[in-house]
Amino acid sequence: VRNKVDFTLPPDVLFLNPWRDPGLRLLLEPEFVWRPMPKARITGFAASEHDEINQRIKGLIRSAVQTRTFSKAIEYNSVPVVLDKASFRKSYVQARDRLVLTGAAGNRLINRFRWENEDTLADVDQRLADYFANCSAGNEGKEIPLYAGLLDPSVPFAIECRNTFNYYHFITESLCQLTVLDGLGFEGDIYFHFPNQEERQRPFAQAYAEALFPEFEGRVFFERVPKDYNSVLSTYDLIGGHYQAPPSVIAGMNRFAPDAIKNHGGVQALGARSALSMNVVNSALLALRARALKAIEGRDFSHLPKKFFVGRDTRLSRVRHMDGEDKLFEHLEMFGFEYVVFESLSPLEQIAIMANAEMMVSYHGAGFTNMLFAGPQTYVIEIGTVQTARHRWGDFWPLAHASQCKYVNFFCDLKSENPLIEPDFQSEGLIPVSMSDKAIGQIMAFVVSLLGQYPELKSPAVVSELAKELLEVGGAEQAIGLLDKHKDMAAQNAELCLLKADCHKDLDEPKSELVALDMAHKADPTRWQTLVRIIWCANRCERPQVIRWALSRLKTDFPQRHDAFVSNHEWVRYVA
């Protein structure tokens, strides 16, 4: 009974509003609430054997890019707080009998309220929306209170855990909270509170705490809920208060949101939750990454590979074997890839292998948590399905944003009797991946091209598809290398010439871009758009004679287009 939370209570009674309700006080004034930061290059490609599934996957990718991708990632601050009359229940924390909405736990609490009340409250979503709108409006002009007293040096620090056996949840939600103690000279004990049976706890939880926070040696404890404190230090992820915050605090974020969010209530509408979780990075996560990279400085990790495929230690994980894994690795091995099981490496080795990695390949799983430690040079390649594209792709986006690596997904088929049928995710969970020979070929062509070893391809369509993939992930140089490998084919194909021009444009090489555009025009003189692009590129290269030639061709072959272009761009008349 002590561990039970009554989710039938009204939101105004159930949830703590830090701007209004007693129980939570900031230990320090936050330097910021949120701020924009560079986003990672995140891409997805369809790699199913079935056209029907590929179309579905492409639709999901398009939807994610157009309706849920912000123009910048958002860093949300995490701050130390003092909680009064704190109760750790399940994977949540209460202060003075109200649930604290903090970080991922806060998101789960909102979901839990919806599930618990969907049969009894016809308007459960509207009720939540009204609650948050009232909070936000009522909090305008207010501040979350600061702790003003002298803090007892022995006061403990406590962290809520989803569990202590899932690597992803522990690292990204719980362990990172310890970073808010940096610079505080904290002297008390630290408690991770979790709901699972003690025997289910995995060794990595203690191992990572010891490896990354050696200053707390002997003071870190794992204790099952329920647990009560009269007063305790904890972490408050300010993203948890996003929907309760004064509108003036959040409004500026809308300029980074896609139109689909701006036009449906903005970033403070509950409908934006999924997109926010994909685009927001907690400052504690960035601090954990910085601490991890500092921990490996000056150590020798030369025994670790820079190109590797990550498999699973099936004794410890929920086994999801991928059809085609052995064949894929046989091909990867020929190009210097090694087989790695993260669980067999120490915490510092796991950090180092990612920090120094050139390329990691694996299938969907908690191992992608280690993307947090990757370098900006690292290509992290995940093999998933239409299911992961729909339900799980966004889980790892914040880790890519944090590390600035290049996160690439190939969505293949489901390992099921009928891969054309997408099973119910809630009842059947994630179905393992099945890679067809075609998918293996697509992935390998991509991988080896990034390594500068270009395959010989038979059709312009296949060359074009691969070159577009390379360009999309930031591999313009490799895309040019691929097109040069097929230069005889490319010279006769306007689309391939234009692709090469796009690559040179991406690399800011306007003279080479102009050469490629000239080839594109020769390959297909019926495209007026190529001539217009030649004019713009020649202007950038300061080649007036080329501008005059292109204008002449435009006037002769496409007089209406010529007249429209000249009337809209007065500068052209001075060149002509």
Where are the predicted features?
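The feature primarily captures lumenal catalytic ectodomains
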Residues: 1-475, 492-506, 526-542, 568-571
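Alpha-helical solenoid repeat scaffolds, predominantly canonical TPR units
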Residues: 482, 516, 549-550
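Short coil turns that delineate tetratricopeptide repeat
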Residues: 491, 525, 556-562
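Eukaryotic alpha-helical solenoid repeat scaffolds
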Residues: 558-576
